[in-house]
Amino acid sequence: MGRRPCCEKIGLKKGPWSAEEDRILINYISLHGHPNWRALPKLAGLLRCGKSCRLRWINYLRPDIKRGNFTPHEEDTIISLHQLLGNRWSAIAAKLPGRTDNEIKNVWHTHLKKRLHHSQDQNNKEDFVSTTAAEMPTSPQQQSSSSADISAITTLGNNNDISNSNKDSATSSEDVLAIIDESFWSEVVLMDCDISGNEKNEKKIENWEGSLDRNDKGYNHDMEFWFDHLTSSSCIIGEMSDISEF
């Protein structure tokens, strides 16, 4: 099967609908309904194709279609549904009674899409301004006040450091003096101990020498005693030997 010829080749009209054509279509659908859109134009006596009759009825001639501009609630609903469903205009139209998919598509592309982009750009600008303001340096007065506060803090810190260093130097000098004093008196005590120890050693040496002298004297005395004793005994032996000879 090839492609069906267009409406012009078979003698059908295209373009805007006239008021007479709208009246014929409304009367026929009101009496017979629309069970078959392809056969409806011939039965109604219209030189239109079935698709054109269907779109004309659904988008413009239905009695339950809302006329006029979209309300803010409807616009917000379309925006939220478009974020969820995308370009599914029939599904969006099913959530909005009285609004057609073609009408919703037209209002989206002509009005809502631009408004959404504008609000997004505005939000981006506000975010950029807020981040830029947060990153920008403060005013000269604030800078001067902050620098004065910083200088005051640094001055106080330096003064505290100087006082702490003075205290540390004073405590260190006191510690040094205490150490020197302790070392001095310890040296004095050691010297006294050395002197007393030397005196004791000298006394021990003198006593030892005296004992040696006494021992020598006693030894000499004993030697003299035994020498005298031996010599006297030898004399006695000699006298006795002389007596025995007589």
UniProtKB/Swiss-Prot annotation:
Where would I find the HTH myb-type domain in this sequence?
9-61, 62-116
Record-linked SMART domains: SANT
- This protein's UniProt keywords: Developmental protein, DNA-binding, Nucleus, Repeat, Transcription, Transcription regulation
Subcellular location, principal: nucleus
The listed locations are: Nucleus
Molecular functions (GO terms) = DNA-binding transcription factor activity; transcription cis-regulatory region binding
| GO BP annotations, alphabetical order | regulation of flower development
- What induces or represses its expression, per the UniProt entry? Induced by abscisic acid (ABA), drought, light and wounding in leaves. Down-regulated by drought and ABA in roots.
Annotated DNA-binding ranges come to 37-61, 89-112
InterPro entries hit by this protein: Homeodomain-like_sf, Myb_dom, Myb_TF_plants, SANT/Myb
GO CC aspect terms: nucleus
Could you say which tissues express the protein in this record? Expressed in roots and flowers. Expressed in shoot apex, axillary buds, at the basis of flowers and branching points of inflorescences.
Q: Write down the PROSITE patterns for this protein, in alphabetical order.
A: HTH_MYB
Per the entry, what this protein does is:
Plays a regulatory role in meristem function. Functions as component of a regulatory network controlling the establishment and/or development of the shoot system by the regulation of apical meristem function. May play a role in tolerance to boric acid.
Q: What else is known?
A: Plants expressing ectopically MYB13 display peculiar hook structure at pedicel branching points, and a reversed order of first flowers and axillary buds.
Name of protein? Transcription factor MYB13
Upper lineage is: Eukaryota, Viridiplantae, Streptophyta, Embryophyta, Tracheophyta
